[in-house]
Amino acid sequence: MERLIGTVSRGVRAPIIRAGDDIASIVAESVLKAASAEKIPFRDKDVVAVTEAVVARSQGNYANTAQIAKDIRSKFPSGEFAVIFPILSRNRFSVCLKGIAQGAKKIYLMLSYPSDEVGNHLIDMDSLDSKGVNPYSDVLTEEQYRSYFGIVKHPFTGVDYVEFYRDLISDCGCEVEVILANDCRSILKYTKNVLCCDIHTRVRTKRLLLESGAETVYCLDEIMTSSVDGSGYNDKFGLLGSNKATEDTVKLFPRDCDTVVQSIAAKLRAATGKNIEVMIYGDGAFKDPVGKIWELADPVVSPAYTEGLEGKPNELKLKYLADN
């Protein structure tokens, strides 16, 4: 019989996941129950995708600001260093910054402009043009930024992130100086000790700093890579991919994800006789044309997946074939 339905995506409702839960069993059982209730047949190469958030929650993979601060003090014992290129996000960075500030005496906060790495804008390009500001070469103090652009709030959240981050640091009893620049090496005029908070460009940023005379350089994926006073950790990504859980706690990106996907796949294979692919996913990596935000604040789109999902797409563009 001719196939009339293409790829179908279904959301499977599962129980609330808590720390200590067997995530592999819960996922497999939820999928099997849903398939039975809805009369969904299983086929080889079906894909079960699990959000990273529930995997991390089941692992109890959390860290609080005191634990982050302790790790920061071990990395920057002088207490004076720069925090450069953080993304502008209360969910993604505010609690991390709070922990960083609690472990510091003075922070030089250097923000990229007109936007952060994932497209959250402090200001728009037209404003730069009208003021004659060159983002490729000009380094702005907070005073210069205010004199040029005044108070600018995020279009969706209504937050002035320059003020928000500055106040968050100072409220922790830490001295702060704000700079806006896009060349990471600009920070070396202020300090030789740097915490790189960019995500996808962090390797290059660290290399440029070390080649240019920086003394101590760490990236976010090097913070909280092992347990601190009983905290969670991520040995591969550190604080990258973390999300705000409470005012003083972050949920870290999940770890040991290969074991999780293999366990889920094995349980589904045993129950169905089919080779079902499994992946853990994070941000979708789309770009919003209105807010100009590129939705990829996680270090990777998928921290783990089964072998059948390996490789690059190999597809035919049907509309091109139809026209030719």
Regions found by a protein language model. Name each.
Residues 2-44, 53-324:
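Conserved mixed alpha/beta catalytic, RNA-binding, or beta-rich assembly cores of soluble enzyme
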